[in-house]
Regions:
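Phosphate-backbone binding interfaces of nucleic-acid-interacting proteins
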Residues: 90-171
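Flanking scaffold residues of small Cys/His-coordinated metal-binding clusters
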Residues: 174-175, 192
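Structural motif
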Residues: 7, 61-62, 139
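Non-catalytic terminal/interface segments that mediate subunit docking, oligomerization
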Residues: 21-118, 180-206
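A glycine-rich phosphate-binding loop feature that marks nucleotide/adenosyl-phosphate handling sites
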Residues: 11-23, 144-150, 163-164, 179-185, ...
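Single conserved hydrophobic/aromatic residue that forms the stacking wall/gate
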Residues: 1-5, 10
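Short glycine/serine/threonine-biased micro-segments
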Residues: 3, 133, 199
Length: 206
């Protein structure tokens, strides 16, 4: 269920766990040193990519993405949650580490995930994170990303991966103003991260 504006929404994600998220448009919440994060894996062309989605109050607060380099950033495929830790260096610069618990209960830390990612993708991710931190509704963030017209095919493919990652956090039943391409009715709503027509059942994911 979800209310418009500053809201609390609760949805059943993957029919296993319930996710609660609060949206505060225009309000920037202070970032704790460590915040919980989800891992979303996706394809960028033929390459395997990964997204770290940092969460505040259950909603996306920041997102970092890049190509999976197993020799530099191996994370077991079954690991889909962890923590993003903000570390301030002695010289005043900052970095972000990712921390997770392995199957044996040991804490594993990958230091400086920002250095592992292509700078161009990192900068786009920082831009998107800035919008998320200001509490823009996820549907609006997705629409903003969709409206970006980028020259590089690789970046456009990456953009689609980010859209898919964020759509997972849109509450089931959230309506849009889109017309169904199948029946023409304005009855499109999100279900399990996919746009679904409530009239004819047409569905589009990704």
């Amino acid at each position: 269920q979800c209310l418009v504006g500053s809201e609390m929404c609760i949805r059943d994600r993957n029919s296993k766990s319930r996710k609660k998220c609060e949206e505060h448009p225009g309000e920037v919440q202070k970032r704790p040193k460590s915040i919980p994060a989800d891992i979303v894996r996706f394809k960028n062309g033929t390459e395997d990519w990964i997204a770290f989605v940092g969460l505040q109050d259950g909603r996306p607060y920041e997102i970092f993405t890049g190509k999976i380099e197993e020799d530099a950033m191996y994370i077991p495929p079954k690991i889909n949650k962890g923590f993003i830790i903000k570390v301030r260096e002695e010289n005043g610069s900052k970095r972000y580490d990712f921390q997770y618990i392995d199957r044996y209960g040991y804490t594993n830390t990958i230091g400086g995930i920002s250095r592992l990612f292509n700078e161009e993708f990192w900068n786009y991710a920082k831009l998107i994170s800035g919008v998320l931190r200001h509490g823009m509704p996820i549907t609006n963030v997705v629409s903003l990303i969709e409206s970006l017209h980028l020259n590089s095919e690789t970046i456009n493919t990456w953009k689609l991966g980010v859209e898919r990652a964020l759509k997972q956090y849109i509450s089931d039943g959230t309506k849009t103003k889109d017309k169904c391409p199948s029946c023409g009715q304005e009855t499109m709503a999100y279900q399990n991260g996919c746009l679904t027509c409530m009239s004819c059942g047409y569905s589009k994911c990704g």
